[in-house]
Amino acid sequence: LKPIYFREPSVNIGVGDNPGKVPHITGEDFRIRYGIGGGTPLDYALTYDDFVAHAQAYGKVGGLDRVATVLNAIRADRPDALLLDGGDTWHGSMTCLKTQGQDMVNVMNALKPDAMTFHWEFTLGSERVQEIVEGLPFAALGQNIFDREWDEPAELFKPYEFFERGGVKIAVIGQAFPYMPIANPGWMFPEYSFGIRDEHMQEMVDEV
């Protein structure tokens, strides 16, 4: 919610043939790959290089009030734009932990995204996720969120949502993080299974 001092990691290990390849590069290698000058705001925001000096020079980063300012500017310039929340939103701070995600839910509702999908949200537990989703004023999408017992799409999460912008009809298909029970405690959401489900995704593409 509030601006913080955030240091990017100094290590990102890729397995197999991936070490040293995007996205498994950090620091100077990252700057060189993307042509970012040393000591610049982007250097501070996207690498760990000389973090203390950069933090002293540039201050804290983030804060949803600043995100709102950017969103308002984009919407004023491009009113037909969609705002999509890719997940990892209802977690990560003490206030989020204490409120069971409600602080972030309130703020995201105020930002008025058009749709969202999921990742760490499920660490709140399936009952809390269901409670929040049932009250959302926007679409909660996940074509790959299935009922574990019946191996069928979970009714709570729509696979897709239609929008019309500038006379163009748009279908947004939700894809939650596929390895949820590996990256997060599976006992917190035993009712659900995930996975890539590429065949079901193709069915949804064909359907829309």
Model segments located where?
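Acidic, metal/ion-coordinating pockets
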Residues: 1-208
